[in-house]
């Protein structure tokens, strides 16, 4: 029976055993660990105090016997057993899962997901085909074909969210309850260090509509402009609140402009659960709005309208796609008056004029501009083409090592988690060889953003990133640190001491545990996917861009 992504429960195992073992698993691990603590240590790939496989298996076998079952044949006897306690999946929830990341999935992908949810139900092929047909016809809406002539579909929930954005955005924009007085604007601009383009964006955000969009490429001064907006509104007695899809972007902008902040998923949960409210004098600033999906944007705009607050969307439709389904920023702009929109087109962050022009080439989404960008990068020596993915990872790590040797800040970006693992393995080997990572690896069961479980080797000296907020420890999703010590308590709890921003923070496996998958929300911090790094500014970036269509050479 499918449980979570990549995990299945064996159909036919008695329910009392499933319940008992879910409750007792940690106790059994701790018991086995205590029995063996003084006699054995893991010789490799485990932390001191973790139970050996032999002792763990024996402890579980004893528990099965105590419950009146034969541990040697329980799995075999479960095969083919009729399991009535597992109903068919909730197909509405399955449809929501299918459209969580893609608002218009291909029909064949929807069929594949439906099949995954039926694993363990002993359904013959003809029945499976009929169930697929019924679910798709009842839960999905036919959208015809995409540009590749593949059949695509969507759901009513997706259409409702997208329609809600299109309907509500102009209503909020029609209000002007938060317009600052001209004298307040002039006072704010008198002390501001900005150019004409930023002045226009500042005026659009403060002098008129209750919904404003400021769009611009990376490095065009969006954060600087918003800093002026926050300062002006706070001086006029308004409350500002910064939010974004990720904690890194939320905290980065919130602290940079001196505003209260809350990550978007948490903010929406608090607003829906009446744990938080927005005074009518609130100005909500959404950073990285281009990465916000339709459902989240529809919920946020609904809350903003009901509280009578103002919202400013900052982002770029030409950068990364939303992390969830639906082009929310594009939808919001469809029916907004031109007074609600400002654009920043001058790149200010890069040092040279040629680098600033290069930023706009990469953003253009135009083949001619892309070839110009590639040719310029080749001439500057910042473009490398190799023959294989292995060579791409080797080249990226060698370049990373050269920046490290020069004590320069550097970040590696890759497209996929598989590429990240290949890069991380190479970096960890270099750090072990140089003595920066020491001691044996401890293997912990970690979980990625989708809840997929994987073994994560960590040791003293490793750089890691936390994947969830641990409020009482001052850690957010994305906090990075260096491991100082790893230990395991007598009850089996793993404790990790980290050096984070100059302070020692101790965090436990229970604090990092994902309640859905059971894995720990922690990963290595040597490289990042492009989505996870959105909103981060660093001096040097190494991008493993993948395989290009012409010739297939990884970059």
Model-assigned labels for residue ranges:
Residues 308, 423, 465-473, 477-555:
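C-terminal accessory regions
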């Amino acid at each position: 029976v499918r449980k979570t992504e990549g995990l299945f429960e064996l159909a036919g195992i008695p329910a009392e055993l499933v319940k008992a073992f879910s409750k007792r698993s940690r106790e059994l691990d701790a018991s086995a660990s205590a029995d063996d603590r003084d006699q054995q240590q893991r010789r490799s790939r485990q932390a001191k105090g973790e139970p050996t496989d032999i002792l763990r298996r024996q402890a579980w076998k004893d528990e099965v016997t105590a419950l009146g079952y034969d541990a040697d044949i329980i799995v075999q006897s479960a095969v083919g057993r009729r399991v009535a306690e597992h109903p068919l999946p909730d197909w509405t929830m399955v449809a929501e899962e299918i459209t969580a990341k893609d608002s218009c999935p291909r029909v064949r992908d929807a069929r594949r997901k439906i099949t995954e949810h039926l694993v363990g139900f002993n359904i013959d092929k003809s029945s499976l085909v009929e169930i697929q047909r019924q679910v798709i016809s009842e839960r999905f809406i036919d959208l015809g074909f995409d540009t590749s002539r593949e059949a695509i579909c969507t759901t009513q929930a997706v259409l409702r969210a997208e329609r809600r954005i299109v309907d509500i955005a102009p209503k909020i924009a029609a209000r002007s309850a938060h317009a600052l007085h001209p004298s307040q604007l002039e006072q704010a601009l008198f002390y501001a260090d900005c150019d004409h383009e930023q002045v226009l964006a500042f005026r659009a955000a403060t002098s008129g509509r209750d919904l404003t969009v400021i769009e611009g490429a990376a490095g065009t001064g969006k954060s600087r402009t918003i800093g002026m907006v926050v300062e002006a509104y706070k001086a006029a007695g308004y409350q500002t609140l910064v939010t974004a899809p990720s904690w890194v972007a939320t905290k980065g902008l919130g602290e940079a402009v001196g505003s209260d902040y809350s990550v978007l998923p948490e903010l929406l949960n608090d607003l829906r659960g009446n744990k938080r409210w927005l005074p009518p004098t609130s100005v909500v600033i959404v950073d990285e709005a281009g990465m916000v999906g339709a459902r989240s944007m529809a919920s946020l705009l609904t809350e903003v309208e009901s509280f009578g607050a103002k919202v400013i969307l900052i982002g770029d439709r030409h950068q990364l796609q939303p992390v969830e389904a639906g082009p929310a920023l594009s939808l919001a702009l469809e029916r907004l008056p031109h007074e609600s929109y400002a654009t920043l087109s001058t790149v200010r962050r890069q040092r040279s004029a040629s680098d600033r022009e290069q930023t706009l080439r990469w953003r253009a989404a135009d083949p001619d501009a892309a070839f110009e960008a590639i040719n310029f990068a080749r001439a500057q020596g910042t473009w490398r083409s190799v023959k294989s993915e292995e060579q791409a990872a080797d080249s990226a790590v060698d370049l990373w090592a050269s920046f490290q040797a020069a004590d320069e800040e550097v970040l590696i970006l890759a497209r996929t988690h598989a590429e990240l693992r290949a890069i991380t393995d190479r970096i960890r080997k270099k750090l072990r060889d140089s003595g920066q990572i020491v001691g044996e690896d401890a293997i912990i069961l970690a979980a990625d953003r989708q809840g997929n479980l994987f073994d994560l080797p960590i040791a003293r000296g490793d750089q890691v990133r936390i994947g969830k907020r641990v409020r009482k420890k001052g850690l957010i999703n994305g906090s990075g640190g260096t491991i100082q010590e790893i230990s395991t308590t007598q009850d089996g709890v793993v404790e990790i001491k980290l050096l984070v921003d100059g302070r020692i923070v101790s965090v436990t496996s229970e604090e990092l545990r994902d309640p859905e998958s059971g894995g720990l929300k922690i990963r290595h911090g040597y490289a990042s996917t492009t989505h996870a790094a959105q909103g981060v500014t660093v001096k040097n970036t190494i991008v493993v861009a993948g395989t290009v269509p012409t010739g297939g050479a990884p970059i």
